């Protein structure tokens, strides 16, 4: 399925590593700051008969066990969040699958943005992108997939986003999960919140619910005012931040269900959610 070569119809491909949560932070920094390998492109001097690898046997997603028993608890959490901030305007953001599977995208000639079979991808959008593959994606085309009007984050005291949902690591559906805030103009991720920071965050809202340990709540704001469960969004410099009037979106990644050793099944997880709050006019 990989069409290598130099012709106009040859594929461009990449191998991407996304390390996180190093046990030894200094060793991790050393690894990131010093390229640990070199990649060579080797072209034979003589033409040879192709002997391509077979398509690998895929690990099957899903166990039949779902997170849907937590739907009532999640609705209680939603109501608790809305009640806590009932003096503010609340806009509930949509959630959908962020990318199609790689094999689906290859067969349809659409850009799947490099998905991994070992993960589930969600984002705050109404639908999954299905744009044609091109050498240099025009990210403005993705505006059609964003909420309308666009979601921005100003610096007003009572303007923020609450991200909440089921902690897929706590339920056993993933071994690692995060969410990332992106600027929609350049798809610049400005910060990732990992599942290690989810623990205990829902108990404040559901103190008497024993299933609160399977849920999480996290705040995104311009000024967190000391809140330990809050990500403070920078405005720059450049792609290191998101402007006050720049549209944004949130994306979630959940990796590797232990029982299957591949990505969770979308049909077995409860989708993560987000609510934008701002002052009532």
Report residues per predicted region.
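A compositional/structural signature for long, glycine/proline-rich flexible linkers
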Residues: 1-281
């Amino acid at each position: 399925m990989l069409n290598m070569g130099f012709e106009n119809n040859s594929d461009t491909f990449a191998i991407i590593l996304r390390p996180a949560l190093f046990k030894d932070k200094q060793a991790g920094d050393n690894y990131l700051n010093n390229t640990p390998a070199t990649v060579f492109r080797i072209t034979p001097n003589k033409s040879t008969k192709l002997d391509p690898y077979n398509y690998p046997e895929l690990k099957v997603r899903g166990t039949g066990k779902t997170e849907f028993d937590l739907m009532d608890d999640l609705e209680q959490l939603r109501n608790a969040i809305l009640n806590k901030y009932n003096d503010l305007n609340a806009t509930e953001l949509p959630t959908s699958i962020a990318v199609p599977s790689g094999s689906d995208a290859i067969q349809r000639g659409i850009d799947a943005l490099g998905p991994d079979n070992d993960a589930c991808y969600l984002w705050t959008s109404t639908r999954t992108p299905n744009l044609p593959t091109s050498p240099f994606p025009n990210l403005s085309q993705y505006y059609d997939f964003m909420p309308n009007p666009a979601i921005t984050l100003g610096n007003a005291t009572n303007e923020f986003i609450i991200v909440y949902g089921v902690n897929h690591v706590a339920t056993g559906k993933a071994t690692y999960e995060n969410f990332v805030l992106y600027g929609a103009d350049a798809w610049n991720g400005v910060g990732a919140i990992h599942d290690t920071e989810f623990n205990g965050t829902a108990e404040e809202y559901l103190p008497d619910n024993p299933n609160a340990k399977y849920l999480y709540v996290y705040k995104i704001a311009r000024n967190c005012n000391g809140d330990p469960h809050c990500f403070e969004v920078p405005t720059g410099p450049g792609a290191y931040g998101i402007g006050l009037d720049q549209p944004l979106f949130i994306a979630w990644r959940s990796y590797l269900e232990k029982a299957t050793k591949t990505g969770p099944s979308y049909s077995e997880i409860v989708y993560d959610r987000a609510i934008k709050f701002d002052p009532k006019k």
